[in-house]
Amino acid sequence: MAIVKVDNLSVQFAAKGGIKTAVAGASFALEQGETFSLIGASGCGKSTILRVLAGLQRDWKGDVELLGNRITAGKRFQGALRREVQMVFQDPYASLHPNHTIWRTLAEPLKIHGESKIEARVAEALEQVGLPAEAAKRYPHQLSGGQRQRVAIARALLLRPKILLLDEPTSALDMSVQAEILNLLNRLKQQHGMTYLLVSHDADVIAHMSDRAAFMANGVIERSFDRAALVNGEHRMAHA
């Protein structure tokens, strides 16, 4: 059953000299438990689609359905969707408040949603992403890039989402740390039964993570790939 449905999605922005079309008529669907990826060069519209699905980009046209709920352009997410759809951003440092301890960063979403047993939930989240309990006392600048991205993933997992949106989650990390984070994401997906929508320009990341993928250029989805095509590296030729 498709838990994400996107039909004829278009997004435009005001730009110098006129209107820029960031996404033009994109259509795709995600099945429960799979990883579907969008690949393409920077500026092709991948991250804009993620922002629409996260409720961050509210000016768009088309039909979007998340977990059986039809999304209305211009409106904030309501109810369970605010918990069930979470996003991990490209730059972990920029997405973490520099003056908040890791404990505060992780505890605040739980408090906002009226959760109980906050101490235990924060400790559990850190353990799930392989961080020691004492990391909760630190500030973002006291952590490595890989550790900060683990915190960002832990924060997204705290509300036990069904859909995780991943915007270039390893592009700011060293190669050795990239593999650790990708393997962590795969393990967590299996443990929690989540569905991933991954954005990347890295053909190796797409092949490692994805069940299916689509190649974008100039706001348009030009080609789709199943798992066999990804294993054969067909997406590399499209991206070349």
Task: List PLM regions with ranges.
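The feature captures the beta-strand-to-loop junction immediately N-terminal to the Walker
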Residues: 39-41
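Conserved ABC ATPase "signature" region
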Residues: 117-134
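A short, proline-enriched helix->beta-strand linker immediately N-terminal to the Walker B motif
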Residues: 158-162
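ABC ATPase NBD coupling module
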Residues: 16, 70-86, 100, 104, ...
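Helix-to-loop junction immediately C-terminal to a conserved catalytic motif
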Residues: 54
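Conserved ABC ATPase signature
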Residues: 139-143, 147
